[in-house]
């Protein structure tokens, strides 16, 4: 049986998620897989690539043919270099750990408590202050016209 290592598309419209799978070469793109050996999330920043290196080496050794897209992923993880014996480094950056949401929330609360608060005026006081400033401005313009 001719096997291929290729991507199986999952996810909604415009939010693709892929699984790296080993399939019969004649099967549908999203059909039944022999084995799932990884996943790829291109929309995450940085993109998430998780591949079981041991299983990839096994399937490549048995003769499974990777597609061009999978070869590109394998080069980024360094698995293709292991298989071919190439010594060039892989281009994967480790994904930074996400901060805990509770810690972020508590930090924002602490920052809000430390910030100086401005005086809050009621609507009626604000309207009275506006009227007083308008009448004062009107009185000054009348004096200039007389002079």
Curated annotation (Swiss-Prot):
Compositionally biased intervals (Low complexity): 126-140
InterPro entries: Ribosomal_bS16 (IPR000307), Ribosomal_bS16_CS (IPR020592), Ribosomal_bS16_dom_sf (IPR023803)
Gene3D superfamilies: 3.30.1320.10
GO biological process: translation
Basic and acidic residues bias (residue ranges): 95-104, 114-125
Keywords: Ribonucleoprotein, Ribosomal protein
Residue segments, region Disordered: 81-147
A GO molecular-function descriptor: structural constituent of ribosome
GO cellular component, one term: cytoplasm
Pfam families documented for this protein: Ribosomal_S16
PANTHER family to which the protein is assigned, alphabetical: 30S RIBOSOMAL PROTEIN S16 (PTHR12919), SMALL RIBOSOMAL SUBUNIT PROTEIN BS16M (PTHR12919:SF20)
NCBIfam families cross-referenced by the UniProt entry: PRK14520.1 (NF011093), S16 (TIGR00002)
Family: Belongs to the bacterial ribosomal protein bS16 family.
Protein name from the UniProt record: Small ribosomal subunit protein bS16
Organism, scientific name: Cutibacterium acnes (strain DSM 16379 / KPA171202)
């Amino acid at each position: 049986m001719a096997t291929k290592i290729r991507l199986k598309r999952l996810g909604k419209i415009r939010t693709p998620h892929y699984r790296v799978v080993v399939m019969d070469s004649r099967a549908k793109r999203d059909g039944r897989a022999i084995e799932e050996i990884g996943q790829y999330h291109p929309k995450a920043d940085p993109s998430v690539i998780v591949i079981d290196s041991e299983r990839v080496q096994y399937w490549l050794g048995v003769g499974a043919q990777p597609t061009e897209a999978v070869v590109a992923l394998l080069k980024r993880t360094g698995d293709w270099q292991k298989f071919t014996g190439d010594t060039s480094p892989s281009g994967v950056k480790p994904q930074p750990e996400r901060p805990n949401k509770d810690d972020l929330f508590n930090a924002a609360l602490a920052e809000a408590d430390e910030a100086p608060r401005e005086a809050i005026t009621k609507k009626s006081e604000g309207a009275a202050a506006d009227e007083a400033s308008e009448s004062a401005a009107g009185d000054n313009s009348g004096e200039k016209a007389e002079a």
